[in-house]
Amino acid sequence: MISRVSRFMTTFVSKYLPDPLIFAVLLTFVTFICAWGLTDSTPVDLVNMWGNGFWNLLGFGMQMALIVVTGNALATSPQIRKFLSTIASIAKTPAQGVVLVTFMGSIACIINWGFGLVVGAMFAKEVARRIKGSDYALLIACAYIAFMTWGGGFSGSMPLLAATPGNPVAHLMMSESNPQGIIPAVSTLFSGYNIFITLSLVICLPFITYMMMPKNGETKSIDPKLIAPDPTFDKKLDKDATLAEKMEESRFLAYTIGALGYSYLGMYFYKNGFNLTINNVNLIFLITGIVLHGSPMAYMRAIINATRSTAGILVQFPFYAGVQLMMEHSGLGGLITEFFINVANKDSFPLLTFFSSAFINFAVPSGGGHWVIQGPFVIPAAQALGADLGKSTMAIAYGEQWMNMAQPFWALPALGIAGLGVRDIMGFCMTALIFTAPIFIIGLYFL
């Protein structure tokens, strides 16, 4: 059954799903029209919201571009190539490759979403190189499907924000018993329902992707250039090399800047615990890449080779920033959330919050953005109904991570690394969306 659904969804997506840029543009107009028709915002207001928000994700877009290029450059270092090759050698058949990529990606995304998203795609690429007859598009889809575990992991935006004093919704939860207005991690990340949902995904996702394996003769051929071995970036100097050339290829400079970076990271983690952020992941990738490549210019050549992967991120993120601000400032996000809240009771509230979050995710594919838009409506409603605040908060996170399988926004880094288009993987991802729904329903309603 899973295989049949996968074939249908893949065929459907290949015909009707546009390029992610077209998707972002169409979403802009849909959000504009809905906000105009359903809220008090005028067209002039909405144009201003869109324009004012258009550049709001510049910092975030830079972070995403960096995680792609630094992760890609790190993967092309000789040591990481050897490591990925060793792990990939565990799989001997295309089916084993699919299971291994999904499982490893799921674990990596639980540890840190940025790390898992990039490393998963790089690992899938290595498996495709090693195992002849692999469906490359399915392997890259497996890496993105594994991203479904991130919201309940250690870098999940929602539980971390909810546990942080001064977060955008903290004032709604302040009381004598909770003066800081926080939801502790024991009520979210380390709760029974989150452990059930996250472990169920780790166990079930490899099985689901295994069942998507194409039948004999149905594996799509790909351009061999996509999985061709990456070039080497070291450079041997001649005896008459200039001082400038020697500095450019200097191991001393590479190791010195590496020592500086690792010293900072050591002090940071000593002070803050193992609190990984996207900036820390980027710094780890960058510093480690310089050290492993062995010289500043060898690393720079690897970065130049990787930058072509960032085009989609650089162009599309501003459109999503504009959509997000329209959604937030017009009140459209609140209307959608209130619609689901009004038909809920204490038991069904987290589940309906989950579906409202999934719906909003098309316009706001960001965990932190969901907390800003939905938190002010979800938290008071949960309090009024007597629903579990931790579960209601995590329901927002689950809806976002689940619907990512139908929203190409977060697939852009993986697709950039893989050299594929969104139509190549979204059929598989939407199949995973369908067959993982029961896991979230059981966890939110019955536990």
Swiss-Prot record:
Cross-referenced InterPro entries: CHP00366 (IPR006161), SCFA_transpt_AtoE (IPR006160)
Gene Ontology CC, one term: plasma membrane
Pfam families linked: SCFA_trans
Keywords: Cell inner membrane, Cell membrane, Membrane, Transmembrane, Transmembrane helix, Transport
Residue stretches spanning the membrane: 17-37, 49-69, 98-118, 136-156, 188-208, 252-272, 284-304, 321-341, 359-379, 402-422, 427-447
Subcellular location: Cell inner membrane
Protein topology in the membrane: Multi-pass membrane protein
Domain of life: Bacteria
Transport found in the keyword field: yes
Major subcellular location class: membrane
NCBIfam families: TIGR00366 family protein
Function: May be responsible for the uptake of short-chain fatty acids.
UniProt name for this protein: Putative short-chain fatty acid transporter
Organism: Haemophilus influenzae (strain ATCC 51907 / DSM 11121 / KW20 / Rd)
Phylogenetic placement of the source organism: Bacteria, Pseudomonadati, Pseudomonadota, Gammaproteobacteria, Pasteurellales
Name of the gene: atoE
